[in-house]
Amino acid sequence: MPKRRAGFRKGWYARQRNSLTHQMQRMTLSEPTSELPTQRQIEALMPYAWNEAHVQPPVTPTNILIMLLLLLQRVQNGAAAAFWAYIPDPPMIQSLGWDREIVPVYVNDTSLLGGKSDIHISPQQANISFYGLTTQYPMCFSYQSQHPHCIQVSADISYPRVTISGIDEKTGKKSYGNGTGPLDIPFCDKHLSIGIGIDTPWTLCRARVASVYNINNANATFLWDWAPGGTPDFPEYRGQHPPIFSVNTAPIYQTELWKLLAAFGHGNSLYLQPNISGTKYGDVGVTGFLYPRACVPYPFMLIQGHMEITLSLNIYHLNCSNCILTNCIRGVAKGEQVIIVKQPAFVMLPVEIAEAWYDETALELLQRINTALSRPKRGLSLIILGIVSLITLIATAVTACVSLAQSIQAAHTVDSLSYNVTKVMGTQEDIDKKIEDRLSALYDVVRVLGEQVQSINFRMKIQCHANYKWICVTKKPYNTSDFPWDKVKKHLQGIWFNTNLSLDLLQLHNEILDIENSPKATLNIADTVDNFLQNLFSNFPSLHSLWKTLIGLGIFVIIIAIVIFVFPCVVRGLVRDFLKMRVEMLHMKYRTMLQHRHLMELLKNKERGAAGDDP
């Protein structure tokens, strides 16, 4: 027999302990959850969504999706509660207004339009049917034709050195207006000089009086251009100064939007030849037709096609069927429109959760364990799970106090964001080509990250439900009386920061922050552990009952032992008696057979003797 190795039992116990520890770590308390809707259920809702979408035309995929969400919202779950959720980077686009932010524009022909190259932007396009709402005048442009609520773009606008598409009196009746203008842009020099070179030296400066265009002569919206104006007879008086656009009294001045309009059509520029005639400007040549390309960076996009825009109750309804969603344009057909849209950094949406709201899984687990231990029916699995939850509580107590989990998660979000932005914008490969292009790409990334940092900053200030990692379910309950679904719907369709029509995001954010800043119940680790241990040990029997249990168990063991040891003897005795009885029966049977045979022989002998005595 082989000898047992030293430490064999110790190693076996260690393996068993590790196995038990692994099993306990995998144990969880599962609550009954409602199943997700099946594909047939969603398909059954589609006809209702289609009917709802027809109530308020036009019918677009976005409108049908919102109607489907509306129908799903009406399907109430008795055990569910609605909370406001913060959803970053939603997969939707919204119309951009004139009073929100400056739109950066990059071009491929910097010798014609100056500025920064679009080499770091990869042109993309896809078909789309778009429907959106906005309370601001939309950034819509129509090429060589008037269109309701769009700004007409004309061809062949003359500058001292170039001829490009842009804004002139065909946009609307021109007048002059006084105002403050963009304070961060200097005034233009009175002494304008014209020099001919390879590149066009555009100089950004403003005039003291703006050119004001009455858009479509409707006397409702006015386009202001703060660049120095000129006359058709003397275009050089205008100077090589790019337009500076603003609408009405909006404090945002678009300094690069003119390059996007220049890409609607063709252009040409002057170039220097040897001065033979001795004229003022020398011998100047004119290039052939040039077709520049203009691009906007993420998160801005362009929708090109035939747009329908209507104004109802101070709300602009934008509809475009079978249009093109793109980030670059190079030529626009006469009569087509182009609008500028943007992906919002976030949206606020009410969502329903079936479980209770909590921001730390370990604390919620401990609470459920304490509740389960206090119930009449308890089990060993709950006791073991309670020990595991206590260990988890110790490991995450600091996390609950300083929100370390949220900080780490935000770091992963920023890292993933940086990777995705670099990948989508295509800057990783093209960023090293030119210093200027590298700075342009870096500027775009920084601007996008700036918006994301603002979103993350708000995300870091609030606590979120622990079960949802890609959205933030806040503590703020959703109240249909304060925020009807119609306002939520308009918020998703593009109306922001309008208390009367859509969600008042500032008020909603302040209410959420008030909840976060309110005094919170501190976690007393000692009291929590004492309470947990009391509930835990209350499941074990007392000493008196344990003694009775041990006595009864001993008696039961003795009875079992007696039965185990006596039963074989009894069985063996019964078997022996049975075998002895059987032997005796066989012996008696055998003896009876012998007696019967002996008697038969006597009878035969007697018969033989009687037969011999007869004469």
Curated annotation (Swiss-Prot):
Q: Which residues cross the membrane?
A: 379-402
**One biological process term in Gene Ontology:** symbiont entry into host cell
Q: Keyword annotations for this protein?
A: Cleavage on pair of basic residues, Coiled coil, Fusion of virus membrane with host cell membrane, Fusion of virus membrane with host membrane, Glycoprotein, Host-virus interaction, Membrane, Oncogene, Signal, Transmembrane, Transmembrane helix, Viral attachment to host cell, Viral attachment to host entry receptor, Viral envelope protein, Viral penetration into host cytoplasm, Virion, Virus entry into host cell
Cytoplasmic topological domain: 403-615
What GO molecular function annotation could you give as one example from this UniProt entry?
structural molecule activity
> In the UniProt record, which is one GO cellular component term?
membrane
Coiled coil spans: 411-461, 495-531
Give the signal sequence positions. 1-84
Q: List the CDD domains.
A: HIV-1-like_HR1-HR2
Function, as annotated:
The envelope proteins induce cell transformation leading to ovine pulmonary adenocarcinoma (OPA), a contagious lung cancer of sheep and goat. They bind to the HYAL2 receptor for cell entry. Env proteins probably do not act as oncogenes by themselves, but may rather liberate an oncogenic factor that would normally be negatively regulated.
Q: What is known of its domains?
A: Both SU and TM seem to be involved in efficient transformation. The cytoplasmic tail of TM is necessary for the transformation.
Can you state the subunit structure given in the record? Answer: Interacts with sheep HYAL2 receptor.
The protein in question is named: Envelope glycoprotein
Specify the species. Sheep pulmonary adenomatosis virus (Jaagsiekte sheep retrovirus)
What's the encoding gene here? Answer: env
